[in-house]
Amino acid sequence: MKTLTVSLLSALCLAAPAWAGQGTPADSVRHLQGVEVTARLRQEQGINPLGVPAKKLPLTISSLADSTLSLRAITQVKDALRFVPAVQMKSSFGAFREISVRGFYNTVYMVDGVRDERSTLNSYPLGDLYNVDQIEVLKGPASVLYGYAATGGVVNVTRRVPTEKFILGAHVRGGSLGYFDLGANVGGKITDGLHFYAGGFLSGGKQWRSTNDKNRSLFASLSYTKGIHNLILRLEGRNDFYGTDAGLAPVMEDDMYRVSDDKLYLKKGELLPGLKREWRYNDASDFMYNRAYNGSLKYTLSLPSGWK
């Protein structure tokens, strides 16, 4: 080990003068003018109103992103909320939806951070999710941040915002009982600072109990950014049809016996003779349309971080 050490030191001593004797290479450093790199972070209004990372707040928030909805082919709110813990949804008369969060049916429903005041009654039709970026659910006492009628929680749906990335998509899907849905969307950059997005969706089919429900929607969004100013215009229209359903007649709450001979007539949970679960229990002339048209214009002024 001692010999090896001496050899290495000798080699270094011999190499140093040889390197020093060589000519100094020409300076290849070029001085450039100052280069400024900037980026813009645009954050849409979510269910967290404080602007602080959720992991640092005592809030219980569950979210489903667009990638999750697309992967599971989810286009309806009732299907999306099945993947959120402590949230349930039930339907009445085929068209009306009731959302329960942690057992409470007082739930606020919002679109792009704006309350849908129909949620005061918590029984109303809901549109499709084809043009949605994400769904967020705020559970527990923190729901008081959104005012009255929010005992259970808050559901916020964020619709798509145009970006400069070009997108072009379409899909066609079919299922049992005659179900089908199809959609198409396109978006991208028009010019510097000006972006657009547009999408349409249609679903229908005979479906369970022959209700022939249909969802039809069109959505368009335009975004313009110049410096610290940003404008987002959203326009949406939908025309949904529901073949309302009163539901099954009550089943037997207990075993039923004949009075004449005291023999078992119907068991607990059975339907009355002649009724079928797949029938639609309503009049053919009883139906419902959900027509809705809305628009919004949002202006955002982004102040520099050093502004006081």
Where would I find each of the regions flagged by the language model?
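N-terminal Sec signal peptide and the immediately downstream disordered periplasmic leader
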Residues: 1-72, 82-84
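Short, charged/polar, Gly/Pro-enriched secondary-structure boundary elements
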Residues: 32, 106-110, 162-167
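Extracytoplasmic beta-strand/coil segments of soluble accessory domains associated
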Residues: 40, 44-54, 58-61, 78-115, ...
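Solvent-exposed coil/turn segments that connect beta secondary-structure elements
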Residues: 40-42, 66-67, 86, 104-106, ...
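Transmembrane beta-barrel architecture of outer-membrane proteins
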Residues: 72, 76, 96, 119, ...
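Short acidic/polar hinge/loop motifs at secondary-structure boundaries
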Residues: 89, 98, 114-139, 158-160
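A beta-strand signature from Gram-negative outer-membrane beta-barrel systems
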Residues: 129-171
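Transmembrane beta-barrel wall of Gram-negative outer-membrane proteins
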Residues: 167-169, 174-204, 209-267, 272-275, ...
